[in-house]
Amino acid sequence: MYMKITKIDGVSHYKKQDKGILKKKWKDLDERKQREKIEARYNKQIESKIYKEFFRLKNKKRIEKEEDQNIKSLYFFIKELYLNEKNEEWELKNINLEILDDKERVIKGYKFKEDVYFFKEGYKEYYLRILFNNLIEKVQNENREKVRKNKEFLDLKEIFKKYKNRKIDLLLKSINNNKINLEYKKENVNEEIYGINPTNDREMTFYELLKEIIEKKDEQKSILEEKLDNFDITNFLENIEKIFNEETEINIIKGKVLNELREYIKEKEENNSDNKLKQIYNLELKKYIENNFSYKKQKSKSKNGKNDYLYLNFLKKIMFIEEVDEKKEINKEKFKNKINSNFKNLFVQHILDYGKLLYYKENDEYIKNTGQLETKDLEYIKTKETLIRKMAVLVSFAANSYYNLFGRVSGDILGTEVVKSSKTNVIKVGSHIFKEKMLNYFFDFEIFDANKIVEILESISYSIYNVRNGVGHFNKLILGKYKKKDINTNKRIEEDLNNNEEIKGYFIKKRGEIERKVKEKFLSNNLQYYYSKEKIENYFEVYEFEILKRKIPFAPNFKRIIKKGEDLFNNKNNKKYEYFKNFDKNSAEEKKEFLKTRNFLLKELYYNNFYKEFLSKKEEFEKIVLEVKEEKKSRGNINNKKSGVSFQSIDDYDTKINISDYIASIHKKEMERVEKYNEEKQKDTAKYIRDFVEEIFLTGFINYLEKDKRLHFLKEEFSILCNNNNNVVDFNININEEKIKEFLKENDSKTLNLYLFFNMIDSKRISEFRNELVKYKQFTKKRLDEEKEFLGIKIELYETLIEFVILTREKLDTKKSEEIDAWLVDKLYVKDSNEYKEYEEILKLFVDEKILSSKEAPYYATDNKTPILLSNFEKTRKYGTQSFLSEIQSNYKYSKVEKENIEDYNKKEEIEQKKKSNIEKLQDLKVELHKKWEQNKITEKEIEKYNNTTRKINEYNYLKNKEELQNVYLLHEMLSDLLARNVAFFNKWERDFKFIVIAIKQFLRENDKEKVNEFLNPPDNSKGKKVYFSVSKYKNTVENIDGIHKNFMNLIFLNNKFMNRKIDKMNCAIWVYFRNYIAHFLHLHTKNEKISLISQMNLLIKLFSYDKKVQNHILKSTKTLLEKYNIQINFEISNDKNEVFKYKIKNRLYSKKGKMLGKNNKFEILENEFLENVKAMLEYSE
């Protein structure tokens, strides 16, 4: 049973309302009619079937455009046989059998291998090549009608019919296997407690196996292992051995192995004495062989078919073939263990799904009240769990920030009492002094009453604690409570946050700053320097600030709109796109700054004004769709490009449907349309849809700008500076204060709780979470016909609070006056004897002391004593990565030599009565040479000069980033992403753990069930405090359930190894420690026994030994994450004596490459030194 419901042309599966049985829709149709509908759908996809099973067309052409009549005739000949429908597109005389061997033109697929039979029936073997030969020899020169009457043709037709029928039978069987064949049964008539009843053989088999494992828990040997030992595949492996010893040609080996597999499976299927469990086991064997012997795998492992030797070595590896005295032998024990592991994996996934369905049936209001459980409902479960993992990541970041306030991480700091030491009169937790770091999170914390600081800190602590418990408990967030000490009784009592006047007052104060913050955002983007007061006033007569912005799926973000607008303007200087005209990226600095300002003004209009208006005007949207199509066609005609017709195949818009539904539907249809092409072609064709949607929104946005003359100034070019004397420019912002108060209620404890929580997390993280919330909201609205809350909280509240936090959060960057700088630095750093020694000591970790001794920019102000705050670098301190990164950077500090190199670049000489630095001269030279290239007037020598200039500019940029510690910040971002990813994986493991416990609970004795219930829903502790489910409690609870521990752990840890030790009652603390190491970010804080990030990845892979997909994703996600930073990483496997696979970095890290002028001229985006930094960070341990 999979958490997926197969759907083919309307055949879906759902839960029957009256009995809770999950079975096929179309319950009134008999099996024959169901098969007819599936066959009709299959025939509609026949083109993709032929491509997949028989053909790979050269240069990815479609068959209709194929000029070679050999290829075309063969294709349509097969199509007629496959569909059993006549077509007039083939001539037998055009088919040349030699093309069957041309690997560049036709590749035979799964049932269609070189010199291997195509179909077998009893003892008869049908070779496609022989059948073709017989037909061609007899009637090659005859017309189609005579060919169709020929015996050999009719034989082929019959074979294809059997072939297709077998495919459809397998598909129907797959549907039956993939549907959820379960029945809920009430464990207790009076309570909503459910168990599971299977309703088909496959589910019954797994159900009975699970029951047997749990009930026979006192057996000495694992029941599962004992059953697997009885599944003997020795004879099959011996036959495979013979093939590898007798054959050398790769396609013959593949074909014969697959034939042997089919014979073996068929024999076992016909042998009714084999039990159902063994049949499932044989299917796992079949999947393993077919996957690794597929054309797709051959292509990937042989470098696109260029080196079959590499693929042959791969096959030997996955078949565990060892060379002994020049004879190839399969290590049968290793191979058997591999299939055993895959079978166990499948088994555990079924158990997980049992538990997951039971949990949601009992606890989720939507699933509990759902009459028919369909695909969309399972998608809802999956989407909700993904969002829960995202929020678990935020909890770890928030808790880490809280730790950074106190400097302590041992134990659980959340929800613990904050005390005030009477001796030192400072805030303390344990023995660690609380430093004044509140400024990092609550900028004006002086407004808090000094006597209330302890209560405020407790409020922050409990705000995180409450969210953590809600995420861990899976149901809903119970927010707004905290505990404070009662003065009279000296006991801690529970209190509502809306009764905390300090927090409520601060919230009201920040809410009142929204208008000022919006103004500051515009002023910080320098609009007052590039636009006159009149133009600014015109702009703000139009602009309307929205704290809750509307979003829809697939709508392009503004970065894509800008890029599309720039590209289309540069195409023959099309005046329609004047709002997006760009200067050369290497033009004068002031022009680049102007573009930033103009684009910011456009972006604010795009999200706040345009979006809501555009999505509400269906008639206008309809016209724009037609306009975009016509314009694309015209551009294609002018440039004589066939791409001009790419938009014509996309459906027009019908005003009867919502705009968001239309955009979603054209994406979906395009994915279905390109299904018939290979993967590379899918990516190319899917891009047409993205381009189409981008042009629709771009055209709509331009129309919006054009209709209001007050905004026409935004297409004007920059000429002179305005207000260059720093004159204050004032303007009014259109803000609906009542609407803001409607969302941001100071008397709502939940709102205050989430506000404190989000305030402890970096803006980037909460912004990413907001995007995930929007996807969740859009999914529930579209698929479930109603917007769902998330953990009991409306999505709009999350969105509004996150926008509020990001907007009103103070930026820790350099201020406009040195007096304000000094004030800010005084709050952030300890001042000792009129010197900022703490600041200097931190800088020494990353910068050579000789550089700091002069106390100059960019680290100190002009008074040579006041520190300059580097905002991004400050984040490493705020979020606790600074200490760890200083260890990584100890051998890569910014040096005196690098400073001298920057000074050389910045040396100025007088040129044409203007002083220009060396770097400015290089930038001017690059612009000049680039213009020559655009005019086709550049020489080869000048191209080389251009590329050398580019390298020097890149070197300068790297040195400047290093000087300003941007490289450290980039490492901080990368490290944070890796830590977040690990938290998400561990949260999934904890969820799986809980679901498995739920699944096995129904098989336990009543006494043990009570213990499990206590484990899943712990009672309040002795102090009356609510205790929530936690995997870390396992050591003290589950081990008390008689006999369950060993068998249970054998299900989760299939290899019985973790951190190179056996999991048993005595050392459960090992993996509990690893869980805490990940969840509490101990990697940043422990002074010794650090587990490297690569080792963490390996341990996570071991932890998910029961889920191969997740194991693969752990590795892949590491690569994907680093690719985001332009880093390419390769792994290799080292195998220790205990046969525990470990991945390590292969050789070194590599930078992605950027393009330069000239053919094949590229440069590495990242410097080697930075790549070494990243490698050191990934491998660092103590």
Swiss-Prot record:
Top-rank taxon, per record: Bacteria
Cofactors, names only: a divalent metal cation
The keyword Nuclease is annotated on this UniProt entry: yes
Biotechnological applications listed in the UniProt record: Can be used to detect RNA or DNA with atomolar sensitivity and single-base mismatch specificity when combined with isothermal amplification, allowing detection of virus, bacterial pathogens, to genotype DNA and to identify mutations in cell-free DNA. Additionally the reagents can be lyophilized and reconstituted on paper for field work.
EC number per UniProt: 3.1.-.-
This protein's UniProt keywords: Antiviral defense, Coiled coil, Endonuclease, Hydrolase, Nuclease, Repeat, RNA-binding
Biological process (GO), any one: defense response to virus
Family: Belongs to the CRISPR-associated endoribonuclease Cas13a family.
UniProt lineage: Bacteria, Fusobacteriati, Fusobacteriota, Fusobacteriia, Fusobacteriales
Region listing for HEPN-like fold 1, in residue ranges: 366-508
Coiled-coil spans in chain: 132-279, 896-955
GO molecular function, one term: RNA binding
Name of this chain's protein: CRISPR-associated endoribonuclease Cas13a
Means of activity regulation: Target RNA acts as an activator for non-specific ssRNA degradation.
Organism: Leptotrichia wadei (strain F0279)
Cofactor details (free text): Pre-crRNA processing is metal independent, while crRNA-guided target RNA cleavage is dependent on divalent metal.
Top class in the EC scheme: hydrolase
Function: CRISPR (clustered regularly interspaced short palindromic repeat), is an adaptive immune system that provides protection against mobile genetic elements (viruses, transposable elements and conjugative plasmids). CRISPR clusters contain sequences complementary to antecedent mobile elements and target invading nucleic acids. Unlike many single-component effectors, this CRISPR-Cas system targets RNA. CRISPR clusters are transcribed from pre-CRISPR RNA (crRNA) and processed into crRNA by this protein. Cleaves linear target ssRNA in a pre-crRNA-dependent fashion, preferentially before U residues.
UniProt miscellaneous comment: Part of a type VI-A uridine-preferring CRISPR-Cas system.
HEPN-like fold 2: annotated segments: 965-1120
Domain notes: The target ssRNase active sites are probably within the 2 HEPN-like folds, and the 2 folds interact in vivo.
InterPro entries, alphabetized: Cas13a_endoribonuclease (IPR053395)
